[in-house]
Amino acid sequence: MNVVKSLCILGLVLVSLIATQAADEQVVGGVSQLEGNSRKEALELLDATLAQLATGDGPSYKAINVTSVTGQVVAGSLNTYEVELDNGSDKKQCTVKIWTQPWLKENGTNIKIKCSGDDGELDRTW
Protein backbone atom coordinates (compact mmCIF):
# COMPACT_ATOMS: atom_id res chain seq x y z
CA MET A 1 0.00 0.00 0.00
CA ASN A 2 2.88 2.38 0.78
CA VAL A 3 4.32 1.68 -2.67
CA VAL A 4 1.03 2.73 -4.31
CA LYS A 5 0.92 5.96 -2.26
CA SER A 6 4.54 6.72 -3.14
CA LEU A 7 3.87 6.16 -6.85
CA CYS A 8 0.79 8.39 -6.73
CA ILE A 9 2.73 11.18 -5.02
CA LEU A 10 5.61 10.82 -7.47
CA GLY A 11 3.16 10.97 -10.38
CA LEU A 12 1.53 14.14 -9.03
CA VAL A 13 4.93 15.79 -8.57
CA LEU A 14 5.94 14.93 -12.14
CA VAL A 15 2.66 16.24 -13.58
CA SER A 16 3.09 19.48 -11.60
CA LEU A 17 6.64 19.95 -12.88
CA ILE A 18 5.62 19.34 -16.49
CA ALA A 19 2.66 21.73 -16.21
CA THR A 20 4.86 24.44 -14.70
CA GLN A 21 7.47 24.08 -17.44
CA ALA A 22 4.80 24.14 -20.18
CA ALA A 23 3.29 27.33 -18.73
CA ASP A 24 6.65 29.11 -19.10
CA GLU A 25 6.98 28.29 -22.81
CA GLN A 26 5.38 30.41 -25.52
CA VAL A 27 2.62 28.53 -27.30
CA VAL A 28 2.50 28.91 -31.08
CA GLY A 29 -0.46 31.16 -31.81
CA GLY A 30 -0.71 32.22 -28.16
CA VAL A 31 -0.36 35.85 -27.10
CA SER A 32 2.31 36.68 -24.52
CA GLN A 33 3.55 39.87 -22.87
CA LEU A 34 7.05 40.65 -24.12
CA GLU A 35 9.78 41.34 -21.57
CA GLY A 36 13.55 41.72 -21.51
CA ASN A 37 15.35 41.28 -24.85
CA SER A 38 12.12 40.31 -26.63
CA ARG A 39 10.53 43.61 -25.58
CA LYS A 40 13.66 45.56 -26.57
CA GLU A 41 13.66 43.94 -30.04
CA ALA A 42 9.93 44.63 -30.43
CA LEU A 43 10.45 48.32 -29.55
CA GLU A 44 13.28 48.54 -32.11
CA LEU A 45 10.92 47.01 -34.69
CA LEU A 46 8.27 49.61 -33.80
CA ASP A 47 10.71 52.50 -34.29
CA ALA A 48 12.07 51.08 -37.57
CA THR A 49 8.58 50.37 -38.94
CA LEU A 50 7.30 53.86 -38.04
CA ALA A 51 10.38 55.34 -39.76
CA GLN A 52 9.71 53.22 -42.88
CA LEU A 53 6.05 54.31 -42.84
CA ALA A 54 7.13 57.97 -42.84
CA THR A 55 9.29 57.49 -45.97
CA GLY A 56 6.24 56.50 -48.02
CA ASP A 57 2.82 58.11 -48.17
CA GLY A 58 2.13 57.40 -44.50
CA PRO A 59 2.17 59.82 -41.58
CA SER A 60 5.30 60.55 -39.57
CA TYR A 61 4.81 59.14 -36.06
CA LYS A 62 7.18 58.84 -33.12
CA ALA A 63 6.46 56.46 -30.24
CA ILE A 64 6.44 58.48 -27.00
CA ASN A 65 5.21 56.09 -24.32
CA VAL A 66 4.71 52.35 -24.83
CA THR A 67 2.49 50.88 -22.12
CA SER A 68 2.13 47.32 -23.42
CA VAL A 69 3.81 45.03 -25.96
CA THR A 70 2.52 41.56 -26.78
CA GLY A 71 3.85 39.01 -29.24
CA GLN A 72 2.18 36.20 -31.12
CA VAL A 73 3.55 33.63 -33.57
CA VAL A 74 1.12 33.45 -36.53
CA ALA A 75 2.67 32.68 -39.93
CA GLY A 76 5.34 35.13 -38.88
CA SER A 77 5.32 37.40 -35.85
CA LEU A 78 2.52 39.72 -34.78
CA ASN A 79 3.44 42.36 -32.22
CA THR A 80 0.72 44.53 -30.69
CA TYR A 81 1.62 47.79 -28.96
CA GLU A 82 -0.44 50.08 -26.77
CA VAL A 83 1.43 53.32 -27.35
CA GLU A 84 1.21 57.09 -27.34
CA LEU A 85 2.18 58.39 -30.79
CA ASP A 86 3.29 61.94 -31.64
CA ASN A 87 3.00 63.27 -35.19
CA GLY A 88 4.70 66.59 -34.40
CA SER A 89 1.53 68.53 -33.69
CA ASP A 90 -0.71 66.05 -31.89
CA LYS A 91 -0.33 63.15 -29.44
CA LYS A 92 -2.71 60.19 -29.61
CA GLN A 93 -3.22 56.96 -27.70
CA CYS A 94 -3.05 54.18 -30.28
CA THR A 95 -2.95 50.45 -30.86
CA VAL A 96 -0.25 49.51 -33.35
CA LYS A 97 -0.04 46.02 -34.86
CA ILE A 98 3.05 44.98 -36.81
CA TRP A 99 2.97 41.65 -38.61
CA THR A 100 6.28 40.52 -40.07
CA GLN A 101 6.97 37.63 -42.41
CA PRO A 102 10.73 38.01 -42.97
CA TRP A 103 10.98 35.20 -45.52
CA LEU A 104 8.87 37.21 -48.01
CA LYS A 105 10.89 39.46 -50.33
CA GLU A 106 7.86 41.71 -50.95
CA ASN A 107 4.95 42.55 -48.68
CA GLY A 108 6.63 40.98 -45.66
CA THR A 109 5.70 43.76 -43.23
CA ASN A 110 2.22 45.03 -42.40
CA ILE A 111 1.44 47.84 -39.96
CA LYS A 112 -2.01 48.78 -38.68
CA ILE A 113 -2.56 51.84 -36.51
CA LYS A 114 -5.86 52.58 -34.77
CA CYS A 115 -5.96 55.67 -32.56
CA SER A 116 -8.65 56.54 -30.04
CA GLY A 117 -10.96 59.21 -31.40
CA ASP A 118 -10.18 58.35 -35.04
CA ASP A 119 -12.79 56.68 -37.22
CA GLY A 120 -10.43 54.90 -39.59
CA GLU A 121 -7.45 52.62 -39.29
CA LEU A 122 -4.18 53.08 -41.14
CA ASP A 123 -3.18 49.85 -42.92
CA ARG A 124 0.05 49.64 -44.97
CA THR A 125 2.07 46.72 -46.32
CA TRP A 126 5.54 46.68 -47.86
UniProtKB/Swiss-Prot annotation:
Family membership noted in the UniProt record: Belongs to the cystatin family.
A GO MF term: cysteine-type endopeptidase inhibitor activity
Domain of life: Eukaryota
Motif position, Secondary area of contact: 72-76
Keyword Iron-sulfur applies: no
Entry-linked InterPro entries: Cystatin-like, Cystatin_dom, Cystatin_sf, Prot_inh_cystat_CS
Signal sequence coordinates: none
High-level lineage: Eukaryota, Metazoa, Ecdysozoa, Arthropoda, Hexapoda
GO CC annotations on file: extracellular space
Keywords: Disulfide bond, Protease inhibitor, Thiol protease inhibitor
Pfam families: Cystatin
Disulfide bond recorded as keyword: yes
One GO term (biological process): sexual reproduction
Disulfide partners: 94-115
Reactive site (site feature) positions: 29
SUPFAM superfamilies: Cystatin/monellin
PROSITE patterns with a match to the protein in the record: CYSTATIN
Entry protein name: Cystatin-like protein
